[in-house]
């Protein structure tokens, strides 16, 4: 218990700066026309401002603290976004505009894959975004709820794809990851399912 308390007390949350909604970017049509998947990344890190802009574009608060930039079924907001970096793993809290530390250290290998199959290009990207479906918020684990959660995770991932294309970042949507390892690391229940991920970074010149 003492070790747990000590670990929590040492957690380093990141209060993100306000999103820059006037940042220079391509139009939606231009982003759609040029969007493509990228699997090689520069080692350049993303600043806190860039992380704020990225997370907001993915599933941030759009208005009135009750709506998100990405739609969800019945506005259930059941998609949780986790940010894997070299230093730690964070959960993005949209209302607070905060990255809440959930685990220290570099755990991006879990996003790359399993011992049987891994795509190590993921380790080049400074950030990986992992989408988790919280079925509790959808009302159950029936087939319909799972399907709606998967659709909503796809909506979130497409926000990643289009935002990255619009501002000069790059990404690729993926389903491969060590689901069991991520679930254990994040302390998820059997109703909280890691479903998709997007490594994000700058293109490698």
Segments (PLM) and residue ranges:
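Short linear sequence motif anchored by a di-proline
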Residues: 9-10, 184-185
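N-terminal amphipathic, basic helical "cap/leader" segment at the start of enzyme domains
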Residues: 10-125
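Generic beta-structure capping elements
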Residues: 19, 132-134, 201-203
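Small-aliphatic-rich amphipathic alpha-helix that forms the alpha element of a beta-alpha
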Residues: 35, 54, 81, 127-138, ...
């Amino acid at each position: 218990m003492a070790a747990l308390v000590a670990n929590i007390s040492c957690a380093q949350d990141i209060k993100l700066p306000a999103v820059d909604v006037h940042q220079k970017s391509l139009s939606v049509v231009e982003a759609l026309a040029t969007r493509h998947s990228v699997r090689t990344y520069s080692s350049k890190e993303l600043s806190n401002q860039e992380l704020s802009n990225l997370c907001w574009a993915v599933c941030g608060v759009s208005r009135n603290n009750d709506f998100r930039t990405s739609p969800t079924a019945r506005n259930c907001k059941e998609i949780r976004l986790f940010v894997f970096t070299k230093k730690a793993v964070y959960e993005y809290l949209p209302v607070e505009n905060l990255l809440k530390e959930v685990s220290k250290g570099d755990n991006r290998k879990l996003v790359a894959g399993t011992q049987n199959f891994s795509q190590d290009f993921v380790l080049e990207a400074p950030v990986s975004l992992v989408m988790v479906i919280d079925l509790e918020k959808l009302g159950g684990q029936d087939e319909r709820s799972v399907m709606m959660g998967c659709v909503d995770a796809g909506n979130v991932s497409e926000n990643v794809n289009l935002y990255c294309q619009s501002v000069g970042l790059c990404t690729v949507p993926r389903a491969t990851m060590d689901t069991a390892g991520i679930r254990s690391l994040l302390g998820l229940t059997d109703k909280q399912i890691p479903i998709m991920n997007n490594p994000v970074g700058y293109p490698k010149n």
